[in-house]
């Protein structure tokens, strides 16, 4: 689906930024449906970062190896694992009637904390 690919591209572009995700501008347009897809893309991205930190190869975002390697160099493994747990919880709560924009902001800030050591 073109919309799905475009959203994945947008999320990956945000996660790839050397200076960290631009939390407010990215999160402004996130609704509940987009939040669910965002959490999924973030989970697969974080899994690839953890794999790189453990001297393995990325599994999900093989088209983004240079960006993943750059992020993995600065990321701390314990923070990535904490972020992975937070994303797992977010995925469980995505159907909850919370404010999707605020949830997206929170997750992107947590990502920045994990990858901008």
Model-derived regions: residue spans:
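Charged, glycine-rich active-site and insertion segments that engage polyanionic ligands
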Residues: 1-117
